[in-house]
Amino acid sequence: RVIIMTKTFVDRYNAVAGSVVMILTLIFGTYWYVFAGYLLCNILDWLTGWYKSRKLGKESSKAGLKGAAKKVGYWIIIAVAFLIPALFIHLGKDLLGIDLGFLVLLGWFTLTSLLVNEIRSILENLVECGYNVPEFLIRGLAVTEKLIHAGVTIPEDHD
């Protein structure tokens, strides 16, 4: 009897987990787990920021709402960063006969940059709360951020 109940539970769990993965893959593609990781980092950053504010006596619902709105804004940036290449890829294929598939890297670059920023923010919040965060994590993320930003140079407009 216990074995049958366990098997039923495992079967249901597998069906639900498989359905969730299928839906996430449908929406976000093969690398859905990167988006899920970013969402997890959003939540952890918001929670560690809230904890830091509470510990420092600076907790306010206005600041919490502002932080949540900022996270929504980041998701909009990611959506736009993937939407623009998708439009240009189809335009290049349909109108110009050119493969512009490499433009999807703009979306991945944007997501990666924001992911590094979220992780750094989580670690900074923990440091400010008195946690002993290993130095290699902080330095490693700083180096990663520098490398990401070194790859992009925006020329100044001298009109």
What would you call each of these model-derived segments?
Residues 40-52, 59, 95-97:
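N-terminal intrinsically disordered, cationic/polar leader segments
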Residues 15-25:
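Hydrophobic, membrane-inserted alpha-helices
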Residues 1-12, 116, 120-159:
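Membrane-proximal cytosolic segments adjacent to transmembrane helices
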Residues 56-78:
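Juxtamembrane helix-capping/reentrant segments at transmembrane boundaries
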Residues 38-48, 74-82, 110-121:
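Alpha-helical transmembrane segments of multi-pass membrane proteins
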Residues 26-34:
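Transmembrane helix interruption/hinge and helix-loop junction motifs
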Residues 70-111:
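Mid-chain, well-packed structural core segment of small domains
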